[in-house]
Amino acid sequence: MSNNLYITATESKSGKSAVVLGMMQLLLRDVRKVAFFRPIINQASTDVRDHDINLILRHFGLDIAYEDTYAYSLQDARELINNGQHATLLDNILKKYKKLEDAYDFVLCEGTDFLGKDAAFEFELNADIAANLGCPVMVVANGQQKAARELIASTQLTIDLLDEKGLDVVTAVINRATVTEAEREEIIKSLECKVNCSNPLAVYVLPEESTLGKPTMNDVKKWLGAQVLYGHGRLDTLVDDYIIAAMQIGNFLDYVSQGCLVITPGDRSDIILSSLASRLSTAYPDISGLLLTGGLEPAANVHRLIEGWTGVPIPILSVKDHTYKTIQTLNELYGKIEPDNDRKINTALALFERHIDSSELGSRLINRKSSRITPKMFEFNLIEKAKRNRMRIVLPEGAEERILRAADILVRREVADIILLGDANTVGSRIGDLGLDMDGVQIVQPNLSPKFDEYVAAYHECRKKKGISMEQARDMMNDPTYFGTMMVHKGDADGMVSGAINTTAHTIRPAFEFIKTKPGVSIVSSVFLMCLKDRVLVFGDCAVNPNPTAEQLAEIAISASHTARIFGVDPRVAMLSYSTGSSGKGADVEKVIEATRIAKERAPELLLEGPLQYDAAIDMDVARTKLPGSTVAGQATVFIFPDLNTGNNTYKAVQRAAGAVAIGPVLQGLNKPVNDLSRGCTVADIVNTVAITAIQAQAEKGLI
């Protein structure tokens, strides 16, 4: 089931908070524990609570600390992005979101309010956040005073832009619409049939409900910081319009309209009394209240006259600012749904219930899980998965700066228990020079280890048939890579990561010698986890086997499918070639055909197809033409290349052209996990590879 939804507007004053209110009520009907999260709020000050968070928490009585319901203010978010810390922003938002996700069954997320001057910035920000949280999206469009065709075009453009960014738009709500019933049907049909999203779109049109967009006298009071002179019990009165009363009574009364707020200097007793009189007269419309400006109050005898009334019929407020400044400030006020305004809340909920099919929408959301995942989400999930059952990972290149910085991160984040190999004095000195805290990290100097002689004997026993003497075995165990691999072999470590300094051959040779391959597997191979903007694909073999045979290719495919499952990728395996189906001939194609046959024979439950060209494997439109009816073509997640030349070049091309994050190579087929780093690896690469190795170790132990 889906466990989240991101509601984003397309512009300001779309009535998004009313839709959020309705969605929360809908979710609480079917889901036991629902959290509310606004990644970005408008308030820069912590003294003032965000309006929508306050509304949802108070009305629904959600037991969530306010500090847990948001990550940044819009101002702070903008500063981080301007300082080149966009990744930090997304990482920290994801961490706060995950805290709620772990504790609740569903997280309802609300985007920014588009109250600033840079709508494009907010649109991009909301899209990035929704993508990195893995949320399906509800788009709320402002339909106020817009023609049907304009609404269709603008909403369609928004949906297409979000879809291009890899977002799963599940529903669009045209709110505050001022269209006819026929136009409403046109909007729904047009958007439903034109949408480019991968899943069907639910479209709803909610009519304008003027009372929700109008401020109350209480809103006016809060906005201006006004003092209430009279009518404390009538502050929920709606304000339809403003009128500045600076003329004589005879002229003023001609301008009185239903629901208007009369603004006048506080010493205009004539306007004050005539306003009160008009409210009591059936011949005049009902005004909403009086706002007295300039810090002036009515004369004492006027006060006495008003106080003599039994129940003052309207609220009377007083502000210190003069009339012109007051009206300027009021022009920026728009109506909000306050937690204590039951009338507005019930109006909003009733509107939502009348015009949105709650059963249909609830079913779409609760029974739906977005398959899209961003690189940051995948990396975050790697770390979290590794942390659940901490493994012991040995790093033979213990004095290398990148290794030490990665070890520091891994220990602080409790991703794995780290063992560093190397000269104890050298490693300790490097740690001190870098100012790192390595409490909890085990440093082992191979030749001084109490296990050294045991490891020498074990290696000699394993390799004596190859002519290795005891003295040669002792020399080998002085090599940290051999020593670390033996730690894994003997169960003193759960996995090893090396290669920041050493070559690939040096890293994996010891594993070939004595860890060896799993039963039924004759070949060690590798895959890259390719994190595209909206999904993770598995590419293999791109690093180890130059020209595998058909049988080896079949083994690589089966191993890659197991690796995919370990990392949460549902395997649909494409055996790649330069032709699709039976269209091509030649030795290379025949090898892939034979490999496909062998793989299907050995793993009949596996969704596997071949030969396929890359475009037919990844693009559904091409697949419909070249291989209609296939369960793999167009939706493959595991791509098996016929040789190293093709695989290595393709993964690098996709990495550069698509901006993909390539994690790997991840070795597969060994009895215990050993993984190789690129000599150009970054600290982040090392952290990810250790997490991957830890997860592989968990899988070997049956923990996942």
From Swiss-Prot:
Signal peptide: none annotated. Its main location: cytoplasm. InterPro entries: DRTGG (IPR010766), P-Actrans_bac (IPR016475), P-loop_NTPase (IPR027417), P_AcTrfase (IPR004614), P_AcTrfase_dom1 (IPR042113), P_AcTrfase_dom2 (IPR042112), Phos_Acetyltrans/Butyryltrans (IPR050500), PTA_PTB (IPR002505). SUPFAM superfamilies: HprK N-terminal domain-like, Isocitrate/Isopropylmalate dehydrogenase-like, P-loop containing nucleoside triphosphate hydrolases. GO terms for cellular component: cytoplasm. CDD domains: DTBS. It comes from the Bacteria. Pathway: Metabolic intermediate biosynthesis; acetyl-CoA biosynthesis; acetyl-CoA from acetate: step 2/2. Keywords: Acyltransferase, Cytoplasm, Transferase. One of its GO terms (biological process) is acetyl-CoA biosynthetic process. Its EC number is 2.3.1.8. NCBIfam families: PRK05632.1, PRK09653.1, pta. The N-terminal region seems to be important for proper quaternary structure. The C-terminal region contains the substrate-binding site. Homohexamer. In the N-terminal section; belongs to the CobB/CobQ family. In the C-terminal section; belongs to the phosphate acetyltransferase and butyryltransferase family. PANTHER family: PHOSPHATE ACETYLTRANSFERASE (PTHR43356:SF3). Involved in acetate metabolism. This is Phosphate acetyltransferase. The lineage of its organism: Bacteria, Pseudomonadati, Thermodesulfobacteriota, Desulfovibrionia, Desulfovibrionales.
